[in-house]
Amino acid sequence: NDQLVNAVKTWEQTGKTGKGVNIAVVDTGLDYTHADFGGAGTTEAYQTALNSTADPLTDPKVSKLLDKTKFKGGYDYAGATYNPNAGNNNPTPDANPIDGQGGHHGTHVAGTALGYGVKADGTSGKTDTAGYQKLTAGDIASWKIGPGAAPEAGIYSYKVFGDNGGTTDLVLEAL
């Protein structure tokens, strides 16, 4: 929501929308298939990504479901079931940092930082040909999801929490 993020005001004052910048999010992973990140935005796309442990950029089934200009890479240090608070101290790392079905906190954080936004019709805000610097708060008021502060930035996602929780034990590995 732009009223909270003030992205439009930032773009107006600085002229910067994240172009040429990459941001790393160390959290629960990223749903890179979401329309907010230029992905297909469908349940089927998400399930396909969720069922893979391969690098999403090289997995032929998954790579076509994401925007390679937005998603630059990442790694899953935790695995879906890792949660030391619940007695599972054994991470099961893999190359796919997809945000699991347990909460999507990492996806939310990434959206606030650098999501494209999602228009009222469900399409990615990346499809707006006017460019972010020309948008006003009124333009994006009807969107389902407002753009993040740096919508033209790329993302690296590092999953350090399991799908249902965890501790900060794996953060240093991701850094």
Predicted ranges, named:
Residues 1-9:
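Autoinhibitory N-terminal propeptides
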Residues 11-168:
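Subtilisin-like serine protease catalytic core
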